[in-house]
Amino acid sequence: MVQEKLRVSTRTLQWKCVESRIDSKRLYYGRFILSPLMKGQADTIGIAIRRILLGEIEGTCITCVKSEKIPHEYSTIIGIEESVHEIFMNLKEIVLKSNMYGIQDASISFKGPGYITAQDIILPPSVEIVDNRQHIANVTEPVHLCIELKIERNRGYRIKTLKNFQDGSYDIDARFMPVRNVNYSIHSYVNGNEKQEILFLEIWTNGSLTPKEALYEASQNLIELFIPFLHAEEDNFHLEKNQHKVTLPLFTFHDILVKDKLRKNQKEIALKSIFIDQLELPPRIYNCLKRSNIHTLLELLSNSQEDLLKFEHFHVEDGKSILDILKIQKYFA
């Protein structure tokens, strides 16, 4: 086990592994911190990275089984202790590691008596067994068992199809999820006059990759989601004279807004891309809008006077305060 004393950076934002251990061949653990973060950022990152880790990291597993000795999934085979269903469940749990693409073939050819384990699977060169001792079946008599397998690399969870194929093959539930669990927690502290946060992230994997590798892949996936925004042409982000116009709906101070037009320099403002966090609103108004699920300037302007006054703790004079702030920051002329 590797464990380090916790030292928090006060300047540069950085990830750091503070604990790493191997509990078994199929259970790796890692604990990471990210700091320093502004208030609210830790929860944003924690939610996003957890979802990516649990749902979008690719894994490899057995997805299909075929054997002449299997009449149907809930049958038994003479000379084998486990039922066919139990064998399928054991094959489903086999942890594989690979860099393959598409679907690959594998097989088992075993003469009893004896125990069939993961090491008896004949694999393509691009696939490895993580734990050779994983149990598959106990052959109690001198019978010859031949099983053909399909191996696939994918992500998420896929439930087997209900129908069997005419060639005698059976789909099994596929769990392409090398990350077994993810927890995150947030520690708040004060640095000078500024409130900051530390994000603690715990990752458990099945041994086909380390928690550090999983975190790296999740971070890459998350970055790739935003790359189109970074490389898109400016025209895709800004309103043009005759395209993608936004009509300002009724607002608390609608009569004033009718006279004010969006500031037209070389670029027009894309209202959807302006978050209320950027407006430097008074804390009471900001919290009121957030609680009412108002996150962008467009969402703010999409509410009528009656709608806004229904928000808890929102007052008539708050509308004028918001308009004054928008004018000061030159969102309106």
From Swiss-Prot:
Lineage top rank: taxon: Eukaryota
Name listed for the protein in its UniProt record: DNA-directed RNA polymerase subunit alpha
First and last residue of the signal peptide: none
EC number of the protein: 2.7.7.6
Keyword field contains Transcription: yes
CC terms in the record's Gene Ontology section: chloroplast; DNA-directed RNA polymerase complex; mitochondrion
Keywords from the UniProt entry: Chloroplast, DNA-directed RNA polymerase, Nucleotidyltransferase, Plastid, Transcription, Transferase
Domain commentary: The N-terminal domain is essential for RNAP assembly and basal transcription, whereas the C-terminal domain is involved in interaction with transcriptional regulators and with upstream promoter elements.
Protein species of origin: Phaseolus vulgaris (Kidney bean)
